[in-house]
């Protein structure tokens, strides 16, 4: 598997890796292998869906393919996460969930040099909630990081808040090969 990852890294700008060992660690050894792989596929499906929505849905603060390319081009390993929450602390809960995917390869998010954040909410998104999300992202990112934030307003989505994050450019995770 590592040989395949090494070969693939030379052809892609960014790479999301889910190690097989994480399946057992997260879901336990008594989980069906088929169920474990389906759970991993759900994570990858969510990543693809999140990136697709970022590119295709026009937002109040728009993020487009050029922004995704800016954050992902030539950046090595990537982390993609999404979190949804409602209630009093929904911003903190959604961004924390988005930043913590137990299946992803042991990537330390601190020091990311590229971060794309997309916030989806109803018209009830507050300035304080927007700031909570931005503050949490700035905590994990490199001080010189390129942080791009988008915001999609879904009028029929009152109460729920979704945060999708793509983080790249982890110095310790970048491939040393050309």
Language-model-derived ranges and their functions:
Residues 1-178:
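Tubulin/FtsZ superfamily GTPase core signature
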């Amino acid at each position: 598997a590592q040989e395949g990852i090494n070969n693939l890294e030379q052809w892609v700008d960014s790479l999301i890796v889910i190690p097989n060992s994480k399946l057992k660690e997260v879901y336990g050894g008594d989980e069906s292998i088929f169920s474990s792989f389906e759970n991993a596929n759900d994570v990858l499906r969510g990543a693809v869906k999140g990136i697709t929505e970022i590119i295709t849905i026009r937002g109040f603060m728009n993020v487009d393919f050029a922004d995704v390319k800016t954050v992902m081009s030539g950046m090595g390993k990537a982390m993609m996460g999404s979190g949804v929450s409602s209630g009093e602390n929904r911003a903190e809960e959604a961004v924390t969930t988005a930043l913590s995917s137990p299946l992803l390869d042991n990537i330390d998010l601190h020091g990311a040099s590229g971060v794309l954040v997309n916030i989806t909410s109803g018209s009830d998104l507050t300035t304080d909630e927007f700031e909570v999300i931005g503050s949490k992202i700035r905590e994990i990112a490199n001080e010189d990081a390129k942080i791009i934030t988008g915001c999609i307003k879904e009028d029929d989505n009152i109460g729920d808040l979704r945060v999708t994050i793509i983080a790249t450019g982890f110095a310790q995770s970048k491939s040393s090969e050309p």
